[in-house]
């Protein structure tokens, strides 16, 4: 073996062979035919050393030779090779020769390094793919199990079948007995006599509960009562829950619930409606990390960027310890939003309690503490998450969202979707599954070697901020920072709002948000696929302006192929001298709601974020982006007649379009009328272009335009 040149440190000639040694003292080297051959390690060392001039062939100082330690590549050599590998994984002979001269390594060392690196990347990708398939298998098994249970224990309240009624009665009796036993255990552990009515009653004593907020014992007892009620709701397979066909979530059987937990439901008397759903999903994250995201207000908001617009801890009754959040009780105020101007945001104050039931089994409980003198539009009944560890770095999460809410401000277009989709349990677990899968993909997936892990993290955080800004601008949340100028938010009455800002260029002092919600007679799946289609992008996207759009790189993948963070570039024909426009896009698909949000980003800023070794600053200290995008929701009312088909595959779509642009305010913080008029005209034209593109693509299915009767 002939080396290209000698090095300053002779032992570096062995670096290329380090990964090729077998446990039997032999080394494996690929020959020109990519076939493996085995050579005794000692003879191989002697041959290489003699050939490179480091030691004579017949040297008698074999003991000294044996004691020599192999040295790894220096940091600079590794940096050069890693950097070139991120650009080209298969260098030609000329590139290998140049790398050899740059790093001081031999040609064979460079060759073997790239071979080993390719094998390493391929192995890591295979392991990651195998892990994702195993998680998907667990999800399908759990779904199959729940479908079988629902099929075998189906309950019809309008049926006169005595066996079904007997089954419901037996289940109610079991639940009542379990609830009574749990209450007695709580009373025994607290050293207090059991109460006369052991059922959990939140609504019957709101004044009493709020007046005792500062009573530690009372707070702890209320939290434990809610915990046991949540466990019963999470583990019950019959009677209490009705599966929704094709929706992957369940709704509460209110009649059975009232029998299990009797008490006056005074909330309904003052106009509150009950929304109660349950959903299960696999999360690619260990259960302790999930608890950390749920218990910390900042992490809680960033983990659900399109769901939570604000979260704050009002008071901590039991502080966390070095062991974690076990036993922590805290009072939180959370503002939840849905990306549509026709659905008002919800602000709810509740008690959050974390308890470790067993090793690998944790429950996080939410229950409201409402003062009777303060009108609240959202009150939480026992809700929360049951988190069960399945295997290392993955767990099963059962979410229950049970609230009493005043939805008088919800538009009739979204009224059928309120109990289950808009603020339901399915949306919580879908977001958890998506975020955890993306976080894992950022660190473990090596399919985009041209972007470093640090750069992928930066772009991932920027994509989350982009989604949060888009949803917040549409819902006009954020403590009243948005001022609505005109419009209700429908197709015929486009809403325009603005907020002051100090970000971005000094020539602009405000951000203008334009949004509208409308119904499309196409399934959500077809609408989502059309919007993501890069070939048709130039037909409706004013940001592209007829350019050719191509995908540059995928930063992170979530649960499926429709859930990605990507960098796109668009190039206009005949304008090569102007370079390319970069677009950061964040999109996800789920039956509980889909989205596609994107923003133009400067290519120099993109390179800085990808190559910079530092993290993005927290909060709003990062680059200023102005999101444009779509929020999609399946029309539940139109899909009711197609039972058994997955939600979103049939029926219509409730689509919300929105974009934000920087503007300059007039004196007195007033909006220029021409700015609002131009924004409304731009939104109207975009809606027309999207409808036209949909009509042209699906005219063969509908025969005529689906947008006209």
Curated annotation (Swiss-Prot):
GO terms for cellular component: nucleus. InterPro entries: GLABRA2/ANL2/PDF2/ATML1-like, HD, Homeobox_CS, Homeodomain-like_sf, START-like_dom_sf, START_lipid-bd_dom. PANTHER family: HOMEOBOX-LEUCINE ZIPPER PROTEIN MERISTEM L1, HOMEOBOX-LEUCINE ZIPPER PROTEIN TF1. Keywords: Coiled coil, DNA-binding, Homeobox, Nucleus, Transcription, Transcription regulation. It holds the Pfam family Homeodomain. This is Homeobox-leucine zipper protein TF1. Residues 212-441 form the START domain. It comes from the Eukaryota. One of its GO terms (molecular function) is lipid binding. Probable transcription factor. Residues 166-187 form a coiled coil. SUPFAM superfamilies: Bet v1-like, Homeodomain-like. The lineage of its organism: Eukaryota, Viridiplantae, Streptophyta, Embryophyta, Tracheophyta. It is found in: Nucleus. Residues 66-125 bind DNA. Belongs to the HD-ZIP homeobox family. Class IV subfamily. CDD domains: homeodomain, START_ArGLABRA2_like. The keyword Methyltransferase does not apply.
């Amino acid at each position: 073996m002939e080396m290209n040149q000698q090095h300053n440190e002779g032992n570096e000639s062995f670096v290329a062979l380090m990964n090729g040694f077998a446990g039997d003292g032999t080394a494996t080297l690929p020959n020109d035919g990519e076939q493996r051959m085995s050579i005794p390690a000692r003879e191989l060392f002697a041959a290489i050393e003699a050939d490179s001039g480091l030691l004579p062939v017949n040297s008698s100082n074999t003991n000294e030779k044996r004691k020599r330690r192999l040295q790894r590549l220096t940091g600079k050599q590794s940096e050069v090779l890693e950097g070139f590998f991120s650009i080209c994984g298969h260098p030609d002979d000329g590139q290998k020769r140049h790398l050899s001269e740059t790093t001081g390594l031999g040609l064979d060392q460079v060759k073997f390094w790239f071979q080993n690196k390719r094998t390493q990347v391929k192995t890591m990708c295979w392991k990651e793919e195998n892990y994702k398939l195993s998680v998907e298998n667990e999800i399908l098994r759990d779904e199959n199990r729940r479908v079988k249970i629902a099929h075998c224990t189906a309950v019809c309240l309008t049926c006169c079948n005595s066996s079904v009624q007997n089954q419901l009665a037996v289940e109610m009796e079991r639940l009542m007995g379990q609830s009574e036993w749990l209450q007695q255990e709580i009373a025994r552990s607290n050293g207090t006599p059991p109460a006369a009515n052991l059922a959990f009653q939140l609504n019957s004593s709101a004044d009493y509960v709020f007046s005792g907020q500062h009573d530690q014992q009372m707070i702890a007892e209320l939290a434990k009562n809610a915990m046991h009620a949540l466990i019963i709701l999470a583990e019950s397979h019959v009677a209490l829950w009705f599966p929704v066909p094709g929706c992957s979530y369940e709704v509460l059987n209110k009649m059975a619930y009232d029998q299990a937990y009797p008490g006056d439901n005074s909330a309904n008397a003052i106009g509150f409606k009950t929304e109660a759903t349950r959903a299960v999903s696999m999360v690619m994250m260990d259960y302790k990390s999930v608890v950390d995201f749920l218990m910390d207000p900042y992490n809680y908001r960033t983990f659900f960027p399109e769901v939570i617009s604000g979260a704050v801890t009002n008071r901590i009754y039991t502080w966390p310890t070095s062991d974690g959040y076990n036993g922590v009780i805290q009072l939180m105020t959370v503002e939840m939003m849905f990306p549509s101007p026709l659905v008002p945001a919800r602000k709810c104050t509740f008690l959050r309690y974390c308890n470790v039931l067993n090793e690998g089994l944790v429950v996080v409980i939410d229950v409201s503490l409402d003062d009777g003198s303060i009108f609240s539009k959202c009150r939480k009944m026992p809700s929360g998450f049951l988190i069960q560890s399945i295997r290392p770095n993955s767990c099963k999460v059962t979410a229950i969202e049970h609230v009493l809410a005043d939805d008088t401000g919800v538009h009739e277009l979204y009224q059928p979707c309120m109990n289950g989709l808009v603020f339901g349990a399915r949306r919580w677990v879908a977001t958890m599954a998506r975020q955890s899968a993306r976080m894992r993909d950022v660190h473990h997936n090596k399919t985009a070697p041209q972007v470093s892990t640090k750069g992928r993290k930066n772009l991932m955080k920027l994509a989350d901020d982009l989604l949060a800004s888009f949803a917040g601008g549409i819902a006009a949340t954020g403590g009243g920072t948005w001022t609505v100028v005109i419009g209700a938010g429908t197709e015929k009455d486009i809403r325009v709002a603005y907020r002051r800002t100090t970000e971005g260029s000094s020539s602009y002092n405000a951000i203008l948000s334009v949004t509208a919600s409308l119904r499309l007679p196409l399934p959500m799946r077809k609408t989502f696929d059309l919007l993501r289609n890069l070939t048709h992008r130039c037909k409706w996207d004013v940001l592209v302006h007829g350019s050719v759009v191509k995908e540059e790189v995928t930063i992170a993948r979530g649960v499926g192929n429709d859930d990605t963070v990507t960098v796109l570039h668009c190039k206009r024909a005949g304008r090569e001298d102007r370079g390319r426009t970069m677009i950061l896009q964040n999109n996800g698909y789920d039956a509980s709601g889909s989205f596609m949000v994107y923003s133009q980003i400067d290519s120099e800023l993109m390179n800085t974020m990808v190559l910079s070794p530092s993290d993005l600053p927290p909060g709003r200290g990062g680059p200023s982006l102005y999101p444009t995008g779509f929020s999609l929701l399946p029309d539940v009312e139109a899909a009711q007649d197609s039972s058994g088909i997955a939600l979103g595959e049939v029926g219509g779509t409730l689509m919300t379009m929105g974009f934000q642009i920087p503007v300059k305010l007039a004196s007195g913080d007033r909006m220029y009328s021409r700015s609002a008029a131009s924004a409304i005209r731009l939104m109207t034209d975009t809606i027309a272009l999207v409808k036209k593109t949909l009509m042209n693509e699906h005219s063969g299915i509908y025969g005529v335009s689906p947008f006209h009767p």
